[in-house]
Amino acid sequence: MKKTIILIFFFSNLCLGQHQSAYKNGEWLNFKISYSGWIKAGKASLELNEDKSTGLYHVKAIGKTTGPIKWFFKVEDYYQSYFSSKSGLPKKFIRKINEGGHTKNLTIDFDQISNKA
């Protein structure tokens, strides 16, 4: 029983001591997308920036078709998300897509106080 209490106390302190964010300002990822490994199909990118004045992270995601695939099925997708750098709670989401003629523009504002989107 004594060992169990000591272990619980030890591990609870480890969890409380972690304050480091998983994100860093300026992080980005770029992807080249291919069909069967040799036909260029598209590209995608993710980018994260922190606005110190508002305390928000701004994430941009872009996906587009390239090469011969673009002639048959054109895709241009843009996503943006804003979320708190402290709590991780979302503030705003923007979606603007064009996938082969199917378009959708969507903006969602999140109000954490009234629990509404």
Question: What positions do the PLM features span?
Answer:
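Sec-dependent N-terminal signal peptides
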Residues: T4-N13
